[in-house]
Amino acid sequence: LGLIEKSEDLTRKVSQPELAKMYETAKKLYDAYRAEKKSPLFLNGRAQPIFPYTTGEKSDQDYKYEDSQIVRFPVYVETDYDTDADGKPDLVKAIVQLPKAVAQGDFKAATILEARPYVAGTLDENYVTLESLGLPTDGSYDMKKLHSQPGKRQPVSSATTVEAAKKAKASDWYYYSPYEYIYDYEDLNWYDYFLVRGYAFISSAGLGTKGSEGFNTTGSDLEINAFKNIIEWVNGKRKAYTDKTSNVEIKADWASGNVAMTGLSWAGTTTFGVAATGVEGLKTIVPAAGIASWYDYFNSQGTQFGNAPYSDLSWLSLYVSTRMLDQDDWAGIWQNYSNYINQLNKDQYAHDRNYSDVWKERDYTLHPENLKTSALIVHGLNDDNVKTKHFELMYDALKKAGQDVKLYLHQGDHVYPAAMSRGYGITANGQDFYDLLNTWLTHYLYGVDNHVESLPAVLAQNNYDPSKWASYDNWKSNQRLFLNASSKRLEETISSDYATAGIEIANRNETVSKASSKANLTFVSDVTEDTTIKGHITVHFKAALAKGQGKNFQINALLVDVADEDFDVVGNGSVKQDKTADGFWMGSNLSNLSVAEYETIKTKYKVIAKGWINLANPESGYDSASSRASIEPKVGEYHDYTVYLQPNLYTVKKGHKLALVFNTYDPSDLTVEHPYEVTFKTDSIQAAIPIVEKTRAQKAAYVPSATDTDYANLPEVEGGALVAPEVHYKQEYTLPSPEYFVQPSQTLPEKDEQMQTGSARQEQSHLTLAVSYGPRFVTTTSESVTEDPQEVTSAVGGEQADHMLPQTGSKDHALGLFGVISLTASSLIFWRKKREDA
């Protein structure tokens, strides 16, 4: 709320002027709760939870507009295209949620949109193929028909927001999903935090899903365009209807026109995809574990992740095509849809695993000049589903576009930092993620000047101590650790036959990090100082096919942190069982979340980064489109390769070792029918590792297997230092200057800055509190990094204070400033308790 600083001594006595200003702030909150005509309240640079909440998780007979403080209703937005060939532009269903004050016209609300194809339901993931669904497997389709544009509908009448909300049924958004065993829309309550702070929330599953028309096309321009159309409706530039048949128009007369998109995974993907269209009104995006280019979700440098059907675009389309659950609806489209899926499969595999036009229309990085939004990009550094390359591709594109972009990199896996469905969230230096997101959206959607754009470019959680977060002024690093492979043999050959090499698939990473074998090459280098890796790692080598047939000969490279003794490190991104109850404040009459911490494990190895390339794609670079061309590998014919390992931000401790490992295929993702062998020129192998510390070069010595008794007796081979190849090097964009870390304020801010309130329009003429005033990125455990990391001394001395915002429950403190605050807020707390029964 901004009553005091987080670092305040709660035992000191309060002065009369301080008390008066605290009372003034408390009264603003008190009055906002009771105002007959409500509008968002902004204190301390954040929207405050002054709107009451009621759930939408009810049966039709129990849900009534009159009893609802959050009103809900469906709309059906008309798109541009007729993908299902029924002669009409497709309609996409969207569920709108608003504070009742917004529906009644008290103020115009900013909108959060989650475009998530899973949200209307899914099919059984174990039976998602044409065969298992009883659909034909031999059809074809004219893909140009997907872009047909018949004439638009003509409205016959219109309905107001309140009229639509009064007619709405809970079953429009709360119904049982027979294959998921949950109720959809499952994100119904994921954004309650923002609803009680005066935002509107819209959820849509898009084309081809239950309640909508059209075909799901797995990330294509058609899918993205349909979600873009929802934003255009919010901006008054497109029509929507109250249902699919009556042609009764409904306008977003409640909307300010300012929209943010956020969501995890596919919903994180659509945020970036829609932003790449340049649609007007989309002010900011917060993609979490989103896909930047679908080619790099299913493939890497000419080789695939996984086997069919899970490596097929069509699998995801079938999985979310819940129009099948409505038999009458499905009866009219199944033939065309199955033909479309057959054609999609043919088109995807017509170019093997190379980049093609199928992937081009699902690559959102191609035109960065269209990006006109700010972005807070969120990604788990242990995410093996949507790999970390995607956040870097997004970051690069947004930087090239000159947009304000920040990275929030946590140690989790494929998870949103506020995991509503799991009942917990994470904090960074004491600030929960929703508090950060509140600050971000308050600035970009309501125009409050809270200096959020001055946040550090990168905030990253430490890999060995998750309580620590480091801040960096940019993502790119100009320093490199060069590892030059050193071996007594100029050539080494490995096989795809892991079994013969004595490698168990379950323990492969641990085994190959220790020594070479018939199935892997391992080179090890000592770490002589703490070294922080920041970015993607390039590994150059020269290799040739030694044995095999076909065109898919995957090479999997690993960089591994290895030590003789166990060390602490975050494992696979799972959280501890013990969580801090109620530590993640929600506000209003919402239940708080628990605060979770990522679990560390004791281990002797941790894979830092992985990369995959096909021997058939020597010209493949980092960007997806560079993987268009391939060759027919010939036995004994050498080519130069550069494999790009996934980006990471990872600190390796002094005394550890870095193991650079080469395998054939990655058995965690793929199986191969025919064995193959690959020969490497060992003196060609070099890794260029981006680091925070100064550039240095080291040798990485070949580690023979225990059975390779001849190796010790071989003479040493002197190899020259390898010059990094220029074939794939691309000029980096120039970072804007300056990018700097915001240091914490040592003094209390002026209260007339700290306690700005009222509407966004009123706020804009004042300077409200800076980022460093409230819960902030810097504490006694954080690091601010420019080139070399350095510990930042916080203004907070001794034990860290509680969160700035009110918490559920209380702690005993000496009567003083904290006691005065409690007294001034007691009437507000009592009133909020009374409203919990609403």
Where are these regions (language model features)?
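C-terminal membrane-anchoring or membrane-association module
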Residues: 825-838
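Intrinsically disordered, low-complexity repeat and linker tracts
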Residues: 698-700, 705-818, 836-838
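Short beta-strand element of the alpha/beta-hydrolase
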Residues: 107-117, 658
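Conserved alpha/beta-hydrolase "acid-adjacent" motif
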Residues: 384-391
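Accessory cap/linker subdomain of secreted extracellular hydrolases
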Residues: 1-51, 60-63, 117, 121-192, ...
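Short beta-strand/loop motif that positions the catalytic acidic residue
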Residues: 371, 377-379, 383
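Acidic, glycine-anchored loop motifs typical of Ca2+
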Residues: 82-89
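Glycine/threonine-rich phosphate-binding loop and adjacent beta-strand/alpha-helix elements that clamp
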Residues: 451-744
